[in-house]
Structures are given as C-alpha cells and as structure tokens.
C-alpha cells in the first residue's frame, strides 16, 4: 500500500473537525511492512502480493528491494491501483487506519497456486488480512501440507475467522483490539486476554501471541501463559509496530532461535520501530536490534 499519514493532537470525534500537524506519504501495507522488517533484520524473504501498474506500485517494488526483500513474485495489476491506507496518528503515537485494498483484491488462490516453488522454498509463512480470505486460507493450507510454520497477523480483523483457518495457524498474533473482536471477549485485564486467547486455542490455533504495545507481548498456548515485557521507549508513531514484531518473529524463528529468544527479539525490534514516524521508514536493521539487546543484558546484569 501507499500510506498517507495524518498527524494531529487528538483523534476527531464523530462530526468533529480537527487541525492536523503534518501529512506524509510512505510505502506501507502489512505484508510489505513485514517483508521489509525481515529483510532489514537479515532474513532471506520473498513476498507474494499484488500492486498496481502505477507509480506507487513501482515505488513499492523498489522499497522492498532496498530493504533486502525479493519482490520478483509480486504481480502488477493493469486494472486496479496500488492499495492505499490513510493513517491517523495522535500526539501519543496511537493510530487508526482506513485501508482501500485496490490491487490487493487480485491476490487470490489461483495466483498463489502459480507460486508453489516459493511455498516449497520457505520455512515460515507470514500472513495478514489485507488480501482476500481465499488467499489466506490457501496459503495456510499449503503451509500445513508442506510442514511450514504459519504466522497469521489477523489485521484488519474480520468479525470472525473460519475455524478451518484457525486450525492451520501456528502463531496467531493479534493486538488487544483484534483479539477482542475475534473472540467476542472485551479485554480489560490479563485475565480477560488469557480467556480470549484460550477460546481461540480451543478452535485449533496452536499458540496465541498477543501484542500489547508498551506492555510487551503475551504468549498463550496449551500449557503456557507468559508475559514478555517490552523495552520502555518514548513512542512517536505505532503505525508499523505490529508488522515489525511479526517480521522479526519470523526472522528469528527461521534462524532457529528458541521461542523465548525469538519473542524477545521481536519485542526489541518493535520497540525501536515506535520511536520513528512512518511504516517502512521506521523499521530497524539488525545492528540496531542487537545493540539494544546488548543494552538490555547490561541493565539486567
């Protein structure tokens, strides 16, 4: 997607007009952000998806390449424009997002069937919900058939995910809002979060990893409930924090890191991303994360 970010003091209420502090354009889209996060962290990543045959589409391909991602599998649609997201960011760095899918609608099952070589090549499949459900389902099915680890970032969250899809997911990574929507349980504390996560595990998900912003991440599976605290930083813009977390998690798991270590690595990467404005422009590189990791070890020594 092409992201249009609007910065303001406070979000407007219904019927209210507020003055903005700035307007920016950056390359974005959840799948592209996740792929760029992997690439900048040293992962060997290839992205599948659809962009328009337009300036924004060409810029997206260039941005992915510059981040170390392989965009050769991307399809450029002659009939639909590159997707667009309008992102509202308040003074605390919190955001609300409206997505116009555009060419993302053409990322369907048939297109993915033509990319089977990449499904066989990879070790981790990272999915998100800005593409049609049929594509998400097919990718998860194919991943399970091939014995791949499937990570699903359920954003933007639908009212319900098919039980079949939940049963194909190794790591479901919602934020608190997405978890509440998918489970039907309004979370007002950790007990509610755990109950909501266990409801989804009861439908077949192996592990639910809830991203909690400045609080870190909560892992819930058949046996474990564990909170991974985040590094405390001054948040500027949370736009791509979840995408960064997912990309870093995938990179770490693909490298063979133990689960605990991989989640801590993802937390550190996301904590760096929120200190900068923008989506792909906010994503850290490997050296930055390792430097912060070293700082953390010194603090705990």
Question: Where are the language model's segments positioned?
Answer:
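Glycine-rich phosphate/adenosyl-contacting loop at the front of the ribokinase-like
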Residues: 1-50, 55-66, 234-236, 301
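Gly/Ala-rich phosphate-binding loop of Rossmann-like dinucleotide-binding domains
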Residues: 39, 144, 254
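Conserved phosphate-binding/catalytic loop of the ribokinase/pfkB sugar-kinase fold
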Residues: 50, 72-77, 87-124, 129
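A glycine-rich helix N-cap at a beta->alpha junction
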Residues: 63-79
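Conserved beta-alpha-beta core of the PfkB/ribokinase-like small-molecule kinase fold
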Residues: 123-195, 214-217
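Conserved phosphate-binding/catalytic region of the ribokinase-like
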Residues: 159-164, 190-301
